[in-house]
Amino acid sequence: MKISFLVTYYNQARFVKQSLESILALNVPCDYEILVGDDGSTDGTVEEIKKYMTENSNIKLFVMDRDVNVTYDAVLRVSAIRLHLLENSKGSYYCILDGDDWYLTKTFVQEALHIMEQDQTLSICAFNFAWVSNDDIKIHSPSIKEGKNSAQEYLLTTYIHAAACVFRNVFDMEKIQFMKELGFFDDQNIMAAHLQDGGMYYIPKVVLAYRQTGSGIWTGMSQYEKHVLDAFEYDIFTKHAHKYEKEIRLRFFTSLKFVWSNRDRFYIELGSKKASNYISLAKKLDGLFYRIINFDKLNTKDRHCVRKILKDTLLHKFIRCVKYMFRLAGKIVKALLPYWLVDLFNKKNKPAIGQ
């Protein structure tokens, strides 16, 4: 058994010590390797990494070519690097880590491997994480129960950072090639890809410090673009985990509906360059988001199909809400009843021995 740590850097020399030493401090109960992908840094990141390579032969460095005259999409770029590292990895398990983040506990890998070796149906062992900024620490509160969870349970509502997980390496070279062609292998895309092939076990222990600089891509987006990005994510998720399309559609329905209702503002809100970039990427995926943005150019049959998908999803979402309200009402009524009445009700409904 072997585990691979896939670490990515770009001009993060000041964080190399903290991130790499947090890996080296882990209690790892098997062979391991640390595959580092650098995206053409110019601030001394590579030199910092090489200092650790002289002391530890388990660290391997992959430096990517970078044209200073080209503007790269950050997500596509880091996805390509991760997939390159994964392609060269030898571990039956792996973890990912961004260069400015770090691990907070020494035992989580040991705990995860113990659980996953006992249950081969698990594709992910997930833990909790904390957002860390210069003046604040905020612990995430995921909407998921401790223990084993199905793919459906996670995909409907939950967010756990992929770097707070241990993954079983379920990808063969054919699947890696497919993901390379897709282009997206970042955070929740990784979660979706793994949930296509297995379940998840969740342990509510904070193991990752997820650094917040205040200048992230998401932080700088308008509300309109955040909805656009979420709707675009729907197409990516369904490519990674197509058998859970219904759950994924419910997860992203609010943004899909928003973009459909406000599609006429697409170029005005985003600007010509950014809007054209989304269109170019969406065309490659050829999914629902692309059809929504181009709704007014679709033929009658395709328009009807888009409307039906949105209408059916809205109905399904309404039914789920009604069921939830009934369950909640039942709990409230039970809580308000006198204890002796609840006990009497439970006794009356308890089957006799031998039934």
Residue locations for each model-derived region?
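Short, acidic, metal-binding catalytic loop of nucleotide-sugar glycosyltransferases
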Residues: 21-31
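C-terminal subregions of glycosyltransferases and related glycan-biosynthesis enzymes
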Residues: 182-184, 189, 196, 211-355
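Short aromatic/hydrophobic "clamp" motif used to bind/position activated sugar donors
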Residues: 94
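Conserved donor NDP-sugar-binding/catalytic core segment of glycosyltransferases
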Residues: 107-139
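Glycine-rich, basic loop-to-helix element that forms the pyrophosphate-binding segment
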Residues: 66-89
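Conserved short acidic donor-positioning loop in nucleotide-sugar-dependent glycosyltransferases
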Residues: 23, 39-40, 99
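Conserved nucleotide-sugar donor-binding catalytic segment
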Residues: 79, 127, 144-225
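A conserved acidic beta->alpha catalytic loop
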Residues: 38-47, 66-68
